[in-house]
Amino acid sequence: MPWWHAVIESRHELQNPTSADKIRLLGERMELGPESHVLDMASGRGGPALLLARAFGCRITSVEQAEEFLTVARERVRAAGVDHLVELVQADGRGFPLERERYDAALCLGASFVWDGLSGSLSALAPAVAPGGFVAVGEPYWRTWPLPEGFEPDPGEDFVTLSETAGRFESAGLTVVGLIASSQDDWDRYESLHWLVLEEWLSEHSDDPQSDEFRERGRRHRERYLRWRRDLLGWAIVVGRRPEVRGVRA
């Protein structure tokens, strides 16, 4: 994990432009309960796992590679008293063994890059949930297409429209049964906390060899968000469901 993310997300309870209420709504859409077993891939600082375990009493296997995030997740899970429900596993998501039909639900929120994009993520996660189970992916999408002249996506931003995003679920054999989209407030809260945290970090680490790089990177991200991305880029959790009948492609 780039050190950049450990700095700018050091105060984020949720590391995506969403809210605690929307994560709990996700749990309702996936019909979670005490008997449910959930896989949370690239789980970061453990925000969604913590909320779902507390709200629904479900078991969660959280997979995260970055020790900086896992350290925080361990502390949060213990403090919340749900360490008997949340299993934290340090592993590269791509290399984590996904047993067929082991889970009732699988999440990948803001981390489809683990499998090189949305289609790869759905292909990896769908077989890991039982028939009738759920796959939820939080993914950016373009609000407008084609993109306006003068705007160039960053490398790796091969996102599509919301309709095309849902279509990829259907192509993976999943029926779209839920959509939880981020509001403008969700986006502004998420992005502007980056700005505050980075400014405080730069003030406290002015002699750090990466300070100039981080300052310039933060300036560029802020300007691009305010000029372009705030209007162009959406983010949503799309929930797909596997067919009930065994043997149907998923």
Per-segment meaning from a language model:
Residues 158-173:
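Short alpha-helix
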